[in-house]
Amino acid sequence: MKFAPLVMSLLAAAIIYAPSAEAAPSAKRSGSSIQIKEAVDDNAISVIKAEKAKLQKGLVVSLEKIGDADLAKLCDAFPDIKGISIRGNKELTSLAPLAKLTQLTSVDISETVQVTDYSPLSSLTGLTDLKVRSDGMSGDLKWMTPLVNLKKVDISSKNLTSFEGIPSLPSLKTASFHYASPADLTPLVTSLPNLTSLHLNYCTLADLTPLAKLANLDFLSFYGATVADFSPLAQSPKLKRLNYYAVKSDNFASLGALKQVSELDGGLTKLADISWVAGLPNLKTFDVFAEHVTDYSPLTKTNVENFTIWNMRTPVGDLGVIGQMPMLKKLKLWSVEGATNSAGLASLANLESFTITTDFNKKGGEAFDLAATAGWNKVRDISIEGADVINADKIGALPELMQVKLSKVNQRSGATVDVSGFAKAPKLSLLTIYDCTVSGLESFATPKLRRINLRNVKGITSLEGLKACPDLYQIEIQNCDIPDSALQGFSDKVKIKRK
């Protein structure tokens, strides 16, 4: 029948594109709460009655995709609810029934876009935890004013334009306000004078001046925010850590005013010039991620100890510049492209931790020169993943080295990695090698080695040298071409796991 294929195709399409049936209502106890989806029906009421006595912290209910009648029914039946979570309830239009729950201590509301009036929460003065994330909330926060016992505050709305109404909470240490566009930060500062940690993620902030009055502020996050000028924060005496990840700003140079800051965590911005870091005497941790920086020389004039370069939008260039950072202790190269002169890192005399992760010059370019390690007399751990390397045989006797991990090394070049140099490290206790072709393991012996992990490793001809390691207690091998005979003759205390 010539129409059979067409008929079958139409039937298949009908099945694929037919509207899916709504999920059936459900209710069950999960951990420390009762979860209810789709409806508060008689079954849900029965489940709560049967399970509530088993909840050690009182009745806590999680609601998903319920309507006004459902919320009213629940609150009428159980006025002793201690905690409530309301999520994904697009049909819900009113929170009025919550006003009856006088024993509530925790409220978590999100995705209730049809709810615009949050005043029913005003009478819940026993609340200690409040989380409201919904764009249905607009204007100010005056409905919050009576809630003076809060210990956790997390508020989010794209339509929030004023922080007026935040209750007086002098003992509150941490608070989060997201997506808001407040014209004035003064109400926040006045009500929460002793904050040590503040998240203003995705907010639009024209003037940061009021934040300088937060005398105890230690951490500040502007993740995804729009910030006109960072310099007012120079007057915040205890500010040590600042997150400006994905911030929109035309004035990153104003970060140079923050002489007191010790940690700057950024990325995914339009940052191209970091000359301002040279003026930050207390800066210890600095990250650059997916940015346009081409000149890293200002870092040589800093006291930065922890530095990460991650997936930059321009070639990284000469690593010898990084090698001139006098105080650098921890260096992480993450998805680095266009890097040259890795041997120039040999001058990092204070380096304690070195990591290459994900890839190194994957799109082409120089292999990483392991001759650089010879100058790292303080390094304790080395981890290299997804990089081609050269001069592995030049690895020196690193006196403080304790851990080495090699993963997917030389997969592009196909070259063998000579690991014998690591055996010269007198304190090496853990060696991990995954997905590599190696040489030098047959004579690998170091006095402090305790564990060795090998997975998908080729080139192993013998493990005889390991028998001379007095502290060795575990060998784990997976998918390696090693004969069983090579695993014989070890001390009884050595636990050998083979998969």
Whereabouts are the PLM-identified features?
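Positively charged n-region of N-terminal signal peptides that target proteins for export
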Residues: 1-5
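Short amphipathic alpha-helix with an adjacent loop that forms part of the alpha/beta core around
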Residues: 47-51, 75, 166
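Bacterial N-terminal signal peptides
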Residues: 7-15
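Cleaved targeting-peptide boundary
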Residues: 24-30
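Concave beta-strand-loop units of leucine-rich repeat
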Residues: 33-42, 57-68, 73-76, 80-93, ...
